[in-house]
Amino acid sequence: MNETDTLFAPASGFGRAAVAVIRISGPAAGGVLATLGGRLPTPRRLSLRSLRDPRDGTELDRALVAWFPGPDTYSGEDMAELHLHGGAAVRMRVLATLARLPGCRAAEPGAFTRRAVLNGRMDLAEAEAVADLIDAETEGQRRQALRQLDGALSRQVAAWRAEAIDCLAAAEAALDFADEGDVDDAGLDAALFDRAARLRDAVAATLRDGHRGERLREGFTVVLAGAPNSGKSTLLNALSRRDVAIVSDSPGTTRDAIEVRLDLGGLPVLLVDTAGLRETAEPIEAQGIVRTRARIDTADLVVALVPPGGAVPDLGPGCRPILIVRTKADLFAGSQPAGDSADVTVSAHTGAGMDDLLDAIQAAAEDGLGTGDALITRARHRAALEACVAHLDRVSGSAGGLPELAAEDLRLAVRALGEVAGHVGVEDVLDRLFSGFCIGK
């Protein structure tokens, strides 16, 4: 990949629209804009221009254009934007014209943000926050992504890393000048191990967050489980307010898990319909039941459905929190059978009890996701911080031992903290991250 090429890509959605934005970034961005529009406009102000094909002078569009000289831009490079009329023909003709200009090429997904990272405009954790903000579907996800984009994690990790570097410098000083009498080995060693232990405790405390950030980012998983014909698919359709699952009187209709995303009070909930739990000799249905068991084991909440005359299904050992729901309330008299232990009674057909069920799921999600802001939002962050704690733990345990070992573990702790913001080992992570971005970002 040539990082000195000038990139271009649509920065707005495809399809018919009022405006289509094309973003240009790289050393030739100003020249490209002048080639199409005749002259460079005043920086950072929209200007009306007639855009023309440089081959024959054909007018492409009358558009608003903007010129952003680097390095104070999103990508850290010279940038330009073309605000075209939103028709597909206009957009495609301008893109084709850009592709013919020397030094220009179409951008890959995430290419502009990749350059922002490489040019120091943001770090890796902040770039991940850009992706999370684009993918955010609920208010809670939006707030969390913006907090990360503002550098909440990056600032804290930078402070920890600075402390770890200070400890490493002290350890290396003790090694380098031990024979010169300028360093008080005993006093320094005691202070060093104490500082390393405090740093370890601070990072470890952050890790004890119940995985709130990752769960908010990925969604609180709620699995609907029960015997065949207990009303799982009907309930899924009612909760999602659309027909996403096939409903049939024939047992065993659902074989594969069906997922629906809900927004409950700003929290993302992933609702999963599963195959009915029963003993069966039918191999495909049996495989679906195995998958149901696996989803139950990893769920944040299991909604156990009990039809009239039925019993609470066997969910297996070690099941996650369970909400027992009596279904098909319209089929039996009274609000609830005597002695029933159900938490909620519902009828997907009449709507009775549905608000109570949604309230119960939302309460479980609020309890599971917590109310505090989380610093850690990705498994990559957690793995790096766990590695840091492990290295600092070894430093604390090496008091009185070889100082070379303590110095090496401090060096590895610094490296682990650097991985969060992308100070080390960034290329592979960039490739994985930006492959999931949209074109033009």
UniProtKB/Swiss-Prot annotation:
GO biological process: tRNA methylation; tRNA wobble uridine modification
Family the UniProt entry places it in: Belongs to the TRAFAC class TrmE-Era-EngA-EngB-Septin-like GTPase superfamily. TrmE GTPase family.
Sequence ranges assigned to domain TrmE-type G in this UniProt record: 219-366
Localization per Swiss-Prot or TrEMBL: Cytoplasm
Matches recorded under PANTHER family: TRNA MODIFICATION GTPASE GTPBP3, TRNA MODIFICATION GTPASE GTPBP3, MITOCHONDRIAL
InterPro entries linked to this entry: G_TrmE, GTP-bd, GTP-bd_TrmE_N, GTPase_MnmE, MnmE_dom2, MnmE_helical, P-loop_NTPase, Small_GTP-bd
NCBIfam families listed in its UniProt record: mnmE_trmE_thdF, PRK05291.1-3, small_GTP
PROSITE patterns: G_TRME
Protein name as annotated: tRNA modification GTPase MnmE
HAMAP family given in the database record: GTPase_MnmE
Chief localization: cytoplasm
EC number: 3.6.-.-
Protein residues bound to Mg(2+): 233, 254
Binding site for (6S)-5-formyl-5,6,7,8-tetrahydrofolate: 23, 81, 121, 441
Quaternary structure and interacting proteins, as annotated: Homodimer. Heterotetramer of two MnmE and two MnmG subunits.
Names of the cofactor(s): K(+)
Keywords on record: Cytoplasm, GTP-binding, Hydrolase, Magnesium, Metal-binding, Nucleotide-binding, Potassium, tRNA processing
Pfam families per record: MMR_HSR1 (PF01926), MnmE_helical (PF12631), TrmE_N (PF10396)
GO molecular function: GTP binding; GTPase activity; metal ion binding
Broad class of enzyme this protein falls into: hydrolase
Binding site for GTP: 229-234, 248-254, 273-276
Binding note for cofactor: Binds 1 potassium ion per subunit.
Stated role: Exhibits a very high intrinsic GTPase hydrolysis rate. Involved in the addition of a carboxymethylaminomethyl (cmnm) group at the wobble position (U34) of certain tRNAs, forming tRNA-cmnm(5)s(2)U34.
A GO CC annotation given for this chain: cytoplasm
